[in-house]
């Protein structure tokens, strides 16, 4: 029987080959993703193996969910131990792990209270609902008139509220009507609230007036292509929120948990939001966990029966999340991300190939912008296909931007190997033609268009 890349036998629920997995997904699953054609069968740390046993370095980290590395043994142990004891109680009853998680996570990040959910999109929805509650009950906004604003090119998820905030046409097409009074345009105009545009932000607050309940923002825009704002952008947002009695909500679902060289990315600006949204790496990729952290007076606007989740705060999730956060501290991942991120960006800049137009990022959340006018007809997708052949996995966003975000356990040697692969791939790409091109980029993978990818 095929080993399935796992040093053991495949089971009935493991595809026995890359071809079988891709064909079955194409036949039986909705086509809402276009994955890079590689199949994960086993992973450890920064390493991934496909069913045939081929090895790759993971430079996406499940969109920064596996900051602690794939299948971290301490997280596996926490998961197995709790799974054999108690997995789910619902919030109809107390369990003996959620209270420990609630105390730990609030102290760990320096907030008063937490509301647990499961996915990042649920955390966004919860934050929006809490902000509206606060707007009506505390600020005194007239019923059904609360406004929630975000910035252009944001990514806050795929739910109706999230796409109502979005400016991405593909995310919104044929999903209307959208949730009213939330968006990323200046109220009363069609002008976007351009990210990192301080004048646009001031105008948005002025035009929204007293009905503005919250401004929701990513400290670094991830899906937009790792857009790092000026140091004073979040400082201005904090100041405007204070002046106008508005809640500042930071979406740290992708940027948080040590990814950018700070525990939370907004710390780079020296500000503190009223609410923080967390997900992804809060559980190290072991289990869906998310939460909203905030001030006590804000969080207590939500009364029993007005919001919840059957799985939110379940003991299995909480046990894994506690251990995941402990591992971040024990293994100095904040410091590692900052040090190794600087080295990685320096290495990317040293490649000095005109195909790499821009290098940007913080910590180990980075991106290269590909100048497709210099690739001899190839795309960033083609470059990712070529890097895959050489053993490195990454994906484009917004067509010509490649996000590079490995697990924070990556070693200096693995970074050096990744830089070698990237350098070789950008040098080889313009000359990739004929049979060699068809081998690397087979017909189904040609002319692939990628906008948002999460």
UniProtKB/Swiss-Prot annotation:
<dbReference type="InterPro" id="IPR050103">
    <property type="entry name" value="Class-III_PLP-dep_AT"/>
</dbReference>
<dbReference type="GO" id="GO:0005829">
    <property type="term" value="C:cytosol"/>
</dbReference>
<dbReference type="GO" id="GO:0055129">
    <property type="term" value="P:L-proline biosynthetic process"/>
</dbReference>
<dbReference type="GO" id="GO:0042802">
    <property type="term" value="F:identical protein binding"/>
</dbReference>
<dbReference type="GO" id="GO:0019544">
    <property type="term" value="P:arginine catabolic process to glutamate"/>
</dbReference>
<dbReference type="GO" id="GO:0030170">
    <property type="term" value="F:pyridoxal phosphate binding"/>
</dbReference>
<dbReference type="GO" id="GO:0005737">
    <property type="term" value="C:cytoplasm"/>
</dbReference>
<keyword id="KW-0663">Pyridoxal phosphate</keyword>
<protein>
    <recommendedName>
        <fullName>Ornithine aminotransferase</fullName>
        <ecNumber>2.6.1.13</ecNumber>
    </recommendedName>
</protein>
<dbReference type="InterPro" id="IPR005814">
    <property type="entry name" value="Aminotrans_3"/>
</dbReference>
<comment type="pathway">
    <text>Amino-acid biosynthesis; L-proline biosynthesis; L-glutamate 5-semialdehyde from L-ornithine: step 1/1.</text>
</comment>
<feature type="modified residue" description="N6-(pyridoxal phosphate)lysine">
    <location>
        <position position="280"/>
    </location>
</feature>
<dbReference type="GO" id="GO:0010121">
    <property type="term" value="P:arginine catabolic process to proline via ornithine"/>
</dbReference>
<dbReference type="Pfam" id="PF00202">
    <property type="entry name" value="Aminotran_3"/>
</dbReference>
<dbReference type="GO" id="GO:0004587">
    <property type="term" value="F:ornithine aminotransferase activity"/>
</dbReference>
<keyword id="KW-0808">Transferase</keyword>
<dbReference type="InterPro" id="IPR015422">
    <property type="entry name" value="PyrdxlP-dep_Trfase_small"/>
</dbReference>
<dbReference type="InterPro" id="IPR010164">
    <property type="entry name" value="Orn_aminotrans"/>
</dbReference>
<keyword id="KW-0963">Cytoplasm</keyword>
<dbReference type="GO" id="GO:0006591">
    <property type="term" value="P:ornithine metabolic process"/>
</dbReference>
<keyword id="KW-0032">Aminotransferase</keyword>
<dbReference type="InterPro" id="IPR015421">
    <property type="entry name" value="PyrdxlP-dep_Trfase_major"/>
</dbReference>
<dbReference type="InterPro" id="IPR015424">
    <property type="entry name" value="PyrdxlP-dep_Trfase"/>
</dbReference>
<dbReference type="InterPro" id="IPR049704">
    <property type="entry name" value="Aminotrans_3_PPA_site"/>
</dbReference>
<comment type="similarity">
    <text>Belongs to the class-III pyridoxal-phosphate-dependent aminotransferase family.</text>
</comment>
């Amino acid at each position: 029987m095929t080993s399935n890349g796992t040093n053991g036998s495949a089971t009935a629920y493991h595809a026995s080959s890359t071809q079988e997995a891709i064909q079955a997904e194409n036949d039986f699953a909705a086509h809402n993703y276009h994955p890079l054609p590689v199949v994960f069968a086993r992973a450890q740390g920064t390493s991934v193996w496909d069913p045939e046993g081929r090895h790759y370095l993971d430079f996406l980290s499940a969109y920064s969910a596996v900051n602690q590395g794939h299948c971290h043994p301490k997280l596996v142990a926490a998961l197995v131990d709790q799974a054999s004891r108690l997995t789910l109680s619902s919030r109809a009853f107390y369990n003996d792990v959620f209270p420990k998680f609630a105390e730990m996570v609030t102290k760990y990040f320096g907030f008063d209270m937490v509301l647990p959910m499961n996915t990042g999109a649920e955390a966004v929805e919860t934050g929006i609902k809490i902000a509206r509650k606060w707007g009506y009950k505390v600020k005194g906004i007239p019923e059904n008139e609360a406004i929630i604003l975000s910035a252009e090119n944001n990514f806050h998820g795929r739910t109706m509220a999230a796409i109502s905030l979005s400016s991405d046409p593909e995310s919104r097409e044929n999903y209307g009507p959208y949730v009213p009074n939330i968006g990323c345009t200046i109220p009363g105009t069609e002008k976007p609230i351009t990210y990192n545009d301080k004048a646009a932000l001031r105008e948005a607050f002025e035009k929204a007036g007293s009905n503005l309940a919250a401004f929701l923002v990513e400290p670094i825009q991830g899906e937009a292509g790792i857009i790092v704002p000026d140091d004073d952008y979040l400082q201005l947002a904090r100041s405007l929120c204070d002046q106008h009695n508005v809640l500042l909500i930071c979406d740290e679902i992708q940027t948080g948990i040590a990814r950018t060289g700070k525990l939370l990315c907004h710390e780079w600006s020296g500000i503190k939001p009223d609410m923080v949204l967390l997900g992804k790496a809060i559980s190290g990729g072991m289990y869906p966990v998310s939460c909203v952290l905030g001030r006590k007076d804000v969080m207590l606007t939500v009364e029993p029966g007005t919001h919840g989740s059957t799985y939110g705060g379940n003991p299995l999730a909480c046990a894994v999340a506690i251990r995941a956060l402990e591992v971040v501290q024990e293994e100095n991942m904040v410091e590692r991300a900052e040090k190794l991120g600087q080295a990685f960006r320096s290495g990317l800049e040293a490649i000095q190939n005109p195909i790499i137009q821009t290098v940007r990022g913080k910590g180990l959340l980075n991106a290269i912008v590909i100048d497709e006018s210099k690739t001899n007809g190839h795309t960033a997708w083609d470059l990712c296909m070529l890097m895959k052949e050489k053993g490195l996995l990454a994906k484009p966003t917004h067509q010509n931007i490649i996000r590079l975000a490995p697990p924070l356990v990556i070693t200096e040697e693995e970074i050096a190997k990744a830089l070698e692969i990237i350098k070789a791939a950008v040098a080889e790409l313009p000359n990739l033609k004929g049979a060699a091109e068809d081998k690397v980029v087979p017909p189904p993978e040609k002319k692939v268009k990628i906008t948002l990818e999460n």
